[in-house]
Amino acid sequence: TVIVDKTSQRILSRETATKTIMTVRTDEGTAGQPVPQTQRNHQVVDDATAIELARHGTQIEALYGLPVDIEWAISDGKIAILQARPITSLPPAPLKDVRWDPPRPGTVWMRRQIVEHMPEPLSPLFDELYLRHGLDHSMETLTVFMSDLSGVKIDLWAFLDPPFAASVNGYAYSIASFNFGLSLLPLALRVYTLVLPKMIRHLLPRWRDESLPGYRAIIADWKGIDLANAPDEELLRGVRALATEDANYWFAAAVALGLARITDAVLNRFVRLVSNGSHLTSGSFLRGLPSKAVDAQVQLEAVARRIDGSDALRQLVLDTPASRLLTALAEHPEGQVVMDDLQQYLDTYGHQIYNLDFAAPTLADAPLPVLLSLKTAVANPERDARARQARLAQERELLVARTEQSLNPIQRPIFKRLLGWAQRYSPYREEALFYVGAAWPALRRLAQELGQRLTQAGSLDVPDDVFYLESAELAAASMARAEGVSRPDLAKLARERRTLR
C-alpha cells in the first residue's frame, strides 16, 4: 500500500506486504503460482511510478469531478489506464475543525443514565422534542411531584442549570455539574432528610400504578387517530406529545431502575464478602424471576409449535432465509395464520428498541431478529423457555437454602433482608425498561404519515426525512403544502442533515 499526497505529489507512507501467490499467463489463460522466495518482499511499484500513478489519478478525478476507482497496468515501464469508475461506497470525508466544547463553558457533561440509550448521533427532531424539550419538561414535572409530596418547595434547577441534556456534535450528553453553594445547603439537607425517604416510598407505586398506565393510555389514544383525515398540525402535535410522554415516563421509571441497581449491587457486595472464595454473585440469586424477555420467548415458541404442526410450513421456515421469510409466508397457502401470530407478537413486543432515537426503526419496523429467533425455535422444538425459567427458579431456591445454612447467625438475617430487597426490585428493572420507547410505533406512524404528505408536496425527498427537520420547519412545510407550494430548500436541508448524521 502506497499513499501519495495528490497535491504535493509526495509519498506519505508505504507498506510492503509479503506476497505468496502470483498470477501468470498460460496457454489456457491464467494460473496462480508460488512467488519465488527472493521476490516475496519486493515492491510492486517504485516511488517514481507511484507518483506517476497518482498524477494520472488526479487528472481523471478532475475530468469527472468525483472520486474514481482506477484500474491500471504497467508494461515495459509504461502505465496503461484500463478502467475508471465512480466510487459509490466512499465514506464521507472527516469533518474539519470539530470541537468538543461543553454546551456551557466550565461545565461537565457525561454520557450516562438516559443518554446511554442514545448510542448514535441524534436526528434533529428527536434532539429537539425529546432531548431538549421532553427531558426538561419531565424534570419540571418531577419537581412539582416532589414539592407536593413533601410540602417543601423544591426547585431542581437551583441545583443544576438547564438544560438537563444537550447534544454535542450530534451526540447526547447529560449535565454532571451541580450547584452546591452554601446558600443551597439548607434545601439540600431537607431534600435528603425529608424528601428522599418519602420519594423512595411513593415513587415506585407512582410509576407502577399511575405513570405506566397513564403512559400506555396516551399511546392508545394516539394509536386510534384517523391518519388519513388528521390535519398536519394534529400529526405533529401527536409526535410532540408522545415524545414528551416517553421522557416523562423515563423519570417516573428511574426510581425502579435505581432501586433494582442499588439492591443488586449491595447484595452482590455482601455475597462476595461472605462467600469464602466461592465466586458467587448476586446474579445467581436472581435467576428464574418474572421476566418480559422470557414471556416474549414463550410467545414466540407458541408460534413455532403452530408451524411445527405443518410439515410444509416447517420446511418453508427452515429453508427460507430470515430476510425473505415474511414474503414467503405471505405467499404460502398456510402462511396467513403464522403471519397473524407474528403480528400479535409484534403488537406486544415490537416497540422494543436498540436506540432511543425515534428515527431508528423499532423491532416491528425491522423484525429480522424475531425471524431469526423463530427459525431457531422451529429447528429446536425441544426448547421450552418457561420450563427453563422454572428450572432456574428451583436451582435458585436450592442455592438460597445452602447459602443460608453456610452463614453464621449474624450474617443470615442480613442476607435474607438484602436478598428480599433484590428479588423484589430486580424484576421491576426489566419491566421499567421494557416500556421505554413504547410510544415509538405510534409516533413513527404519525411522523411518517406527515412525511409522506410532505414528500408528495415536494418538501421532502422521502417520508423518513421528516425526522431530519425540527418542528418549526415541519410546520412551515405543512403551511406551504396547504398553499400548494413546495419547499425544496427544506428537502435539501433534511438531506444534508441526514448525510451529516
Q: What residues fall within each predicted segment?
A:
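Contiguous hydrophobic, helix-prone segments at protein termini
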Residues: 43, 47, 62-68, 76, ...
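Generic beta-strand/beta-sheet core signal
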Residues: 73-75, 82-87, 469
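Conserved catalytic core of nucleic-acid polymerases
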Residues: 2-45, 368-376, 382
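Protein kinase-like catalytic core scaffold
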Residues: 68, 80-83
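A long amphipathic alpha-helix within ATP-dependent nucleotide-binding catalytic cores
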Residues: 33-73
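Flexible, active-site-adjacent loop/turn segments at secondary-structure boundaries
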Residues: 14, 19, 33, 43, ...
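Extended active-site and interfacial segments that coordinate phosphate-rich ligands
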Residues: 1-29, 82-131
